[in-house]
Amino acid sequence: MADLKPYIAKAASGEPLPLGDAKAAFDIMMSGQATPSQIGGFLMALRVRGETVPEIAGAVASMRSRMIPVIAPDDAMDIVGTGGDQSGSYNVSSCTAFVVAGAGVPVAKHGNRALSSRSGAADALAALGINIEADADTIGRSISEAGLGFMFAPMHHSAMRHVGPSRVELGTRTIFNLLGPLSNPASVKRQLVGVFAPQWLEPLAHVLKELGSETAWVVYGDGLDEMTTAGTTQVAALENGQIRTFEITPEEVGLRRCSPAELKGGEAAENAKALLGVLEGKDSAYRDIVLLNSGAALVVAGKAENLKDGIAQAVQSIDSGAALAVLQKVIAVSNDKPA
């Protein structure tokens, strides 16, 4: 039986693990050969010292080697936040996914239940009536017929069951928050990824480049793991093999600046109701932040020329009823009913 203890000692000493060692350590954890306390100790040793790009890449390699894949079109994208930002905000990326799909871009959405917040993507989508435990074939059909499929992380990364209890007991963000957006079961090549701290912007853009992404924006919104309308958003954009950084304010793209309090969400049922309200065309700060993120996603997808163009397309997706129609189709297909 392989032993995690040498890797714990190495991480705790402050020494970075090479990619091969990181993969080996995650292979041990993902195959059930480590105790919950060993897993917790290893994850916190990495967090306190600070995870490195090779460690993240090694961990992703371990996860990808075990995942149940989903077939999606080549132009499909993911819109996902790492979580762990402690903001308790609405489910921005989930709502954004429907708007982007309504604008004609296939979305393979990867997500989980809440670990460090009150409502994760899976919690809100389940509250809306989506079967989050649909199998890979059904999800593939949902992407092709409805324009969006939701991939519930534990269904595709069953090896995660070995680390889940430790993550919940820790109750704080770990390297696994970084891994979810990098381990999409549909192997998408276009991503809008929100991170919980600005120091991860460029490292994650580099990891995505190493892992074969074509276009990606990694964003941090002044305390949110999404682009924000309550402050300034920092972006590390991977485009044409190059990574560039820039900032965006809501005013420069014609959106109203709101207060952080206006973006506060609640439990899953409350967040689901608010998400439905946005798709039904209700005006709110939640709608504005979804428009901003949708505009960016449409730029990443190559559907929009620039952010203002993307936001205009997002407005059309909502106001025409297209985004709401995507939700209704996904509910039907995920529950094995005709779209």
From Swiss-Prot:
Its EC number is 2.4.2.18. Mg(2+) 1 binds at S93, E226. Pathway: Amino-acid biosynthesis; L-tryptophan biosynthesis; L-tryptophan from chorismate: step 2/5. One of its GO terms (molecular function) is anthranilate phosphoribosyltransferase activity. Binds 2 magnesium ions per monomer. Keywords: Amino-acid biosynthesis, Aromatic amino acid biosynthesis, Glycosyltransferase, Magnesium, Metal-binding, Transferase, Tryptophan biosynthesis. Mg(2+) 2 binds at D225, E226. Its cofactor is Mg(2+). GO terms for cellular component: cytosol. It comes from the Bacteria. GO terms for biological process: L-tryptophan biosynthetic process. It catalyses: N-(5-phospho-beta-D-ribosyl)anthranilate + diphosphate = 5-phospho-alpha-D-ribose 1-diphosphate + anthranilate. 5-phospho-alpha-D-ribose 1-diphosphate binds at residues 81, 84-85, 89, 91-94, 109-117, 121. Gene3D superfamilies: Nucleoside phosphorylase/phosphoribosyltransferase catalytic domain (3.40.1030.10), Transferase, Pyrimidine Nucleoside Phosphorylase, Chain C (1.20.970.10). Catalyzes the transfer of the phosphoribosyl group of 5-phosphorylribose-1-pyrophosphate (PRPP) to anthranilate to yield N-(5'-phosphoribosyl)-anthranilate (PRA). Homodimer. Belongs to the anthranilate phosphoribosyltransferase family. This is Anthranilate phosphoribosyltransferase. The gene is trpD.
